[in-house]
Each structure stands twice: as C-alpha cells, then as structure tokens.
C-alpha cells in the first residue's frame, strides 16, 4: 500500500499480467473470481461499513489486488473521511470513485485510484480531460466500455491509463476495448473472467 518502489507497482503489475479485472457484486462473485488464478485485480462494488473489512480481507487472502468502489459502500458518505475509514480499517489497495475529491484524498493517503466516468455526451468527454489534470488518478475507468472509437479518442487525449468497464460481455468486447487503447477491462461477467 505504500507508494514507494515495488508496492507502487502492484496494481500496474496486476493489470499488466492480466488485463481483465473482475468487478464483483456479491460474496459468491468473490469466491468465483478468487478461484481463477489468472484474475489479479478485483473491483469491489458492494458491501457496507460493517462488512467491507471482511470482504477486502477475503480478496487479499487470495493474493489479489482489492479496489473498493467507495461510492457504492452502504453507510459511507461521499466525503473524504470515508476514504480515511477504508484506509485505516481495511486492507484495500485503493479506491474507485466518481468523485474527484475522494480520489485526491486517496492519493494523499498512498492508495491506488480509479476515477470512474460515465460517458454520456461530449461534455463528459471534456470533463475527463480537465479533471485528469487536476486530480491525477492512477487510472480512469470509462463506462460503458463498449465504445472503441470513443475509448480511442480518450486514450489519444489523456496521459492517464484507461480501463473500459460496463456492458463488456464477450471476447469481442474485450479485444475491441484493448485494441482501442484501454490498458484493461473491468467486467461483472463470469465468462469474461475466464478468458
């Protein structure tokens, strides 16, 4: 977790060795993806303040990188203190959030950061460009991830590595996103995890 030397590389190495990130919504999902040796990175999209430490521990015990989507954890408010809570009370390697202030706080605390964006229109595209300069997340996740032309445009206009997420259901989607320049794809689809 400390951002120095080797530890700083852990999330980059995880997506480097396998560009498929398992996005999980239940303990059943966690058990399934923890059993797949090739899966290195896990996006945790569920839990609450009482269970998140156990959820993260299960992922870490399996030797995987645990990224918690802080916006989706019940009982945590969209404030910086929530990031501090995760850092102090869990073994999470980092956070995912749509909120730049939370990304900024996580970076200060030495956690990995994924700024998640929903690409609804050209304004959202402009916002990505502006905010990546201000917040400097480690990765930007764009949703939906099934728009290779848009992903290619984003990759051409930002320096931050891009993760494609949302609606990725088959090998064709994965290959299209990676060919467009995404460094990885995140998916809740169990078939995609086994690729």
Give the location of each predicted region:
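Short, acidic/polar
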Residues: 23-35, 79-85, 123-131, 170-174
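Glycine-enriched alpha-helix->loop->beta-strand junction motifs that scaffold or abut catalytic
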Residues: 36-42, 89-92, 108-114, 133-139, ...
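Catalytic beta/alpha-barrel core
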Residues: 21-25, 40-49, 67-75, 90-100, ...
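Conserved N-terminal beta1-alpha1 strand-loop-helix module at the mouth
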Residues: 3-66, 74-76, 91
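Glycine-rich phosphate-binding active-site loops on the catalytic face of alpha/beta enzymes
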Residues: 44-47, 144-150, 166-195
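Short beta-strand/loop segments at the ligand-binding rim of alpha/beta enzyme cores
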Residues: 12-20, 62-71, 91, 109-118, ...
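Surface-exposed amphipathic alpha-helices with a cationic face
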Residues: 9-14, 56-63, 87, 103-110, ...
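Conserved, mostly hydrophobic/aromatic
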Residues: 33, 99, 177
